[in-house]
A protein has these predicted regions:
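Short, Lys/Arg- and Gly-enriched loop/turn segments at beta-strand edges
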Residues: 136-143
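His/Asp/Glu-enriched, well-ordered alpha-helical/loop segment
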Residues: 2-18, 25-133
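Glycine-rich nucleotide phosphate-binding loop and flanking beta-alpha elements
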Residues: 20-21, 139
């Protein structure tokens, strides 16, 4: 937090899976830095989207239950939550606006790694990769290169 506060060119990366960071800390971070300096990340491991069970992460056995991956001693090993679920969590549980959550999951990361001229927003000349959401923030459409994909 201190490094980001001291450097205007840094972003805060928040794991918003409902395990790593409490909603009150999410709200405080947005209030302190503004949505323009927050990047949502998932800390997602390769077992994300698979059934609960035992998997390997970095050569270590991990147990996945719900959206959490732990070592056998209970230590958090990572998340089994995708970025869409993280975005949904900040909106529904931390009270962050949908517009800010989308910016933090798309535009801000693209700017940070220097590819905002290609992706990160829906604009002419950019990659047309996006999802359509319903009012409950469920994915109802997926588009890659402007072509609808099956959900």
């Amino acid at each position: 937090i201190g490094a980001v506060r001291d450097s205007q060119s840094c972003h805060v990366e928040l794991i918003c899976d409902g395990v790593h960071v409490h909603p009150s800390v999410i709200r405080a971070t947005f209030a302190m830095f503004g949505a323009e300096r927050v990047i949502l990340i998932s800390d997602s491991m390769r077992a994300t989207g698979l059934e609960d069970g035992e998997y390997t992460l970095g050569g270590q056995p991990v147990v996945v239950k719900g959206n959490l991956a732990t070592l056998h001693d209970g230590t958090i090993a990572g998340s089994a939550t995708n970025l869409m679920d993280c975005m949904r969590f900040v909106v529904k549980n931390a009270g962050i606006s949908l517009e800010d959550a989308v910016m933090c999951a798309t535009e801000n990361p693209a700017r940070e790694i220097g590819i905002f001229d290609q992706t990160g927003s829906i604009e002419e000349g950019k990659k047309a990769d996006f999802v359509l959401l319903d009012k409950e923030l469920n994915i109802v459409g997926i588009y890659i290169d402007g072509k609808e994909q099956s959900c």
